């Protein structure tokens, strides 16, 4: 094997090893945070459970807040979310994209269900973690902008609705609290939540004619 090929191979091995180490640390942290509470867990304890040196944890995540940030990102924007987003990117009809946003929301919250209490508890105790949660909400708000703008560009929005209002309505209906109240506390299945949300988003944001066209396309 040429020297350049050996270097690439060695680099790939190091990358896989680093990812495996990160996964072990995050798995250990999630288990400890869930069982012992966030405040009661130290970096040293996480390192011991993961089978690595504390210096390795600091090198990869900098702090306990960094670990929590990584856990939240994996929970909110993990593989289910990526799969839903890929499906959404193939939709050219703006009404269909608005309706399919329900699938994206479900993917986010269904993935994070195991960590829902952990994340909400963390946000309740630490201003830094509340700020972190707000960052994720801001990201979610920004990611929805193109879908709403496309709806307006095709003049399929509900009459009298402004773009900024439509963005806020979409953001509100797809919030974690709505999912929590309906699924976790209300006993709805994720399927029922997704169907309801899809229909409510179209009714709230789309004009009647475009809404009827979308509904007929489902028959």
PLM regions with names:
Residues 1-20, 213-219:
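N-terminal intrinsically disordered/low-complexity leader segments
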Residues 24, 28, 32-66, 70:
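Helix-turn-helix
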Residues 43, 72-79:
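Short, basic, alpha-helical segments at the C-terminal edge of helix-turn-helix-like DNA-binding modules
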Residues 63, 112, 125-126, 176:
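Short loop-to-helix capping motifs
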Residues 70, 83-110, 167:
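Hydrophobic alpha-helical connector segments
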Residues 103, 107-120, 128-155, 164-168, ...:
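Amphipathic alpha-helical packing segments from all-alpha helical-bundle domains
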Residues 152-200, 208-219:
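Hydrophobic/aromatic-rich alpha-helical bundle segments in the mid-to-C-terminal region
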């Amino acid at each position: 094997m040429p020297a350049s090929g050996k270097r690439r191979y060695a680099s790939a091995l190091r990358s896989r090893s680093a990812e495996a180490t990160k996964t072990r640390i995050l798995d250990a942290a999630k288990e400890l945070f869930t069982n012992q509470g966030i405040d009661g867990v130290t970096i040293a304890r996480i390192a011991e459970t993961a089978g690595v040196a504390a210096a390795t944890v600091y090198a990869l995540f900098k702090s306990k807040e960094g670990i929590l940030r990584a856990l939240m990102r994996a929970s909110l924007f993990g593989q289910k979310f990526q799969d839903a987003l890929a499906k959404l990117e193939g939709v050219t009809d703006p009404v269909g994209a608005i309706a399919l946003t329900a699938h994206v929301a479900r993917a986010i919250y269904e993935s994070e269900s195991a960590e829902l209490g952990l994340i909400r508890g963390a946000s309740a105790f630490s201003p830094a973690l509340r700020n972190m949660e707000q960052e994720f909400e801001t990201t979610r708000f920004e990611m929805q902008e193109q879908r709403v703008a496309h709806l307006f560009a095709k003049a399929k929005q509900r009459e009298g609705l402004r773009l900024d209002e439509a963005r806020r309505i979409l953001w509100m209906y797809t919030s974690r609290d709505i999912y929590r109240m309906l699924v976790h506390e209300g006993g709805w299945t994720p399927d029922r939540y997704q169907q309801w949300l899809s229909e409510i988003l179209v009714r709230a944001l789309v004009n009647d004619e475009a809404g009827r066209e979308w509904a007929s396309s489902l028959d």
